[in-house]
């Protein structure tokens, strides 16, 4: 018998990651300032496959406290992803937070109150965990075609995927207010109320393109969803003689509302 020749095409994937950060802290009088700057790069490449992707993040954070009572946090990040449309690869995401530790105020100093803090924050974040090459038009084998009076057909190319126009980050605009409370060195309570407004969610494109085209309609960043709710955590920690025990419970209520998912009317 004649030998059978087998040919296997392998793939080598390389993953390169680089991170760097710098931290600067300063204290003067009743002031406390801490700043952090971070840079990260992540690159993944597979030899022989068009699935390579790269990500970059530049982040700056600052925390300021006055007299251990009044707190302010600022954050600004810039993110880039090769998965996105070349004109929309960079996203800017700011955030701000503030807190007030009331238990440090003289008018609330007492033996039974251990800790009481009011806090609020607002920030924008983005995610882009999409498939590679969604923004590109892709061509593939188009089957057999006859040219003029030729008796045999010939293979050709056709458009198999319409790229997502303006593919960008899905964004989350989140507002949170809360209170942290601890008393008698035993009881602790945390209450959070939040509102999350998500925009640019990738959803089906609907009937934006006629079915005569012969391919699936590309998705679009048109989805909008609102989430709001409240979360409560209550804990009790105590000790009786040599016996230590913990009791705790959590309650959460969340309401979700779809504002837009590019539905057909």
Predicted regions and their residues:
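Extracellular/periplasmic, surface-exposed regions of secreted and cell-surface proteins
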Residues: 1-265
């Amino acid at each position: 018998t004649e030998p059978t020749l087998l040919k296997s095409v392998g793939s080598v994937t390389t993953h390169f990651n680089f991170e760097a950060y710098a931290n600067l802290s300063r204290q003067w009088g009743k002031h406390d300032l801490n700043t952090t700057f971070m840079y990260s790069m992540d690159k993944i490449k597979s030899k022989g496959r068009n699935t390579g992707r790269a990500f970059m993040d530049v982040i700056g954070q600052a925390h300021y406290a006055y007299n251990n009572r009044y707190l302010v946090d600022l954050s600004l990040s810039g993110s880039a992803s090769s998965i996105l449309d070349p004109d929309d690869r960079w996203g800017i995401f700011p955030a701000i937070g503030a807190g007030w530790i009331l238990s440090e105020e003289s008018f609330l100093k007492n033996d039974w109150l251990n800790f009481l803090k009011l806090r609020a924050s607002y920030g924008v974040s983005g995610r882009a965990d999409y498939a590679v090459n969604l923004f590109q038009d892709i061509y593939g084998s188009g089957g057999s075609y006859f040219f003029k009076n030729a008796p045999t057909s010939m293979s050709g190319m056709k458009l198999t995927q319409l790229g997502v126009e303006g593919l960008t980050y899905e964004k989350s605009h989140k507002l949170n207010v809360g209170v942290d409370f601890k008393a008698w060195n035993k009881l602790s309570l945390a209450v959070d109320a939040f509102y999350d407004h998500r925009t640019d969610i990738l959803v089906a494109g609907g009937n934006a393109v006629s079915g005569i085209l012969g391919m699936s309609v590309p998705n679009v960043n048109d989805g909008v969803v609102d989430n709001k709710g409240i979360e409560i955590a209550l804990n009790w920690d105590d000790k009786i003689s040599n016996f230590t025990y913990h009791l705790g419970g959590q309650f959460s209520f969340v309401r979700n509302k779809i504002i837009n998912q590019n539905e057909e009317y």
